[in-house]
Amino acid sequence: DLHKAIRRQRQMCIRDSDFYLHRTFEKQDNFAGTIFTDCQNKRNLGDSNTIIYGHNMKNGSMFGQLKQFKQPETIQKSKYIWILTPDEVCKYEIFSCYTAEVGSDTYTLIKGPGKGLVEYAEKMQAKDTLGLTRREFDVKDKVITLSTCTGNEATRYVVQAVKVEP
């Protein structure tokens, strides 16, 4: 499932965000690429909004299962995403799922805590197309933005979640 896909992949980052689109974490050519963070994000998920990219593979690998979050039943089964880092197991609660335009405000990098994060998260929550329960955000929250291709070069499917543990 999606949780296993994220857990298995190393989150990669390099100055060119497109580098890992068609390379493994060992930098070997591979059509599926790997799951990787935006090149401007900290590798430890320490930014207020960390953007994570992965291909929408038909075989379900990488972020191929992200499209399942277009169906309300998927969220009803589990509204959480877990990410394993070398230091901790992080649990995130999904608050928004939608199709975004490439280069839209969805891809705003927010480095540190503050009111800007709350405003951003509230705006992204309003884009949700599944009718998820509204939540309150805090200036210290950590958000992840999972982004994958849709088959349309102008859009991406996005699932956003806020860290709830630890």
Describe the residue ranges of each PLM region.
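Single conserved hydrophobic/aromatic residue that forms the stacking wall/gate
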Residues: 1-14
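Extracytoplasmic/periplasmic soluble domains downstream of a signal peptide or transmembrane helix
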Residues: 15-166
